[in-house]
Regions:
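Compositionally biased terminal segments of proteins
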Residues: 1-141
Length: 141
């Protein structure tokens, strides 16, 4: 979910409590709030880049397009190596977009902070990946 501007952890937690939800805060630091509610992990993150979010879901939720999400994940690989990002990128690159298309969009959003050469290298380098969130893919052979 995307919101323009800074996140406000107290307001977020108040909204959960108003809805009588039990919440476990796992991280609360400048620009980021991680919590667990109903066994679902949420990350609220102050993302300093202006990303379009034109896809509307249920008249009140707006998210980026799949290509924009792929560009964000490509950029994120340079800062963190999360298994879930590799999995998401696997399916996006396999079924929807090329590395060049993702890179073009990432360069549009992140400019010289993004490197297609680095991204291609990261797709082939698995040392240091965080497997904290393992996906159970029973539909894969």
């Amino acid at each position: 979910l995307f919101k323009n501007g800074a996140i406000h952890p107290k307001k977020i937690l108040t909204r959960f409590k108003e809805n009588k939800e039990d919440v476990l805060v796992t991280l609360n630091r400048q620009g980021q709030l991680n919590l667990v509610c109903r066994k679902v992990k949420f990350t609220f993150f102050n993302f300093e880049y202006d990303i379009e979010h034109p896809v509307e879901i249920e008249e009140s939720i707006f998210i980026p397009s799949l290509l924009d999400l792929a560009a964000m994940k490509a950029f994120a690989l340079g800062m963190r190596s999360k298994w879930k990002d590799y999995m998401d990128l696997y399916f996006i690159l396999k079924d929807h977009y090329t590395i060049s298309q993702v890179s073009e969009k990432a360069h549009l959003y992140f400019g010289d902070l993004y490197s297609e050469k680095l991204f291609r290298g990261q797709l082939n380098y698995f040392k240091g990946i965080s497997f904290e969130v393992l996906l159970h893919l029973s539909f894969l052979p």
